[in-house]
Amino acid sequence: VSTRPIADAGDLLRRIPRDSPVAWVRNGDGIVGWGVAARLEVRGRERFSRTQRWWNQLCASAVIDDTVSVPGTGAIAFGSFAFDPERDMSVVIVPKVVIGRRGGQSWITTIGLGTADPAELSPVNALPKAPTSVTWSRGSRERA
C-alpha cells in the first residue's frame, strides 16, 4: 500500500468510475476508488465480526507506506452491509487505486504490487445526470 501526495485531485465527482463506483465525497473532499485489490462477501449475524477479522488480517500482512497520513489515506476499504443478516449479502471492497482530497491536500493510494501514474489512472467523466423525477410508492414490511 503506497500513498503519495499529488498536485490536485481535480473534481472527485468526475473521477467516479462508471462500471464499479466506490466513493465517499462531501463538499469537494473525499475519496474515489476503482479496481478491486481484495473483496469480501459475507452474510449472517457474525458479518461485522467476520469483516473485522478479515480486515485486521489484511492490514497485518500489508506493507503500508503512507507519506500523507491524513484520514482516508493508507489501507482503505468501502463496505455495504445488509440490514437483514440472513437474507442479503454484505460486500467489502479494497480498491486498487484511490484518489482523495482533504482540506486542500490531494493524494493517490495504490494497493497491490507496483505503483500507478496518476495521469493514467482514471479518465475524467461527465458528471452524473440529476434525476428528472421522483416516484413515490407504498412500501411493505415483513414481521421480523
Please describe what each predicted stretch is:
Residues 1-144:
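Signature of the chorismate-utilizing enzyme
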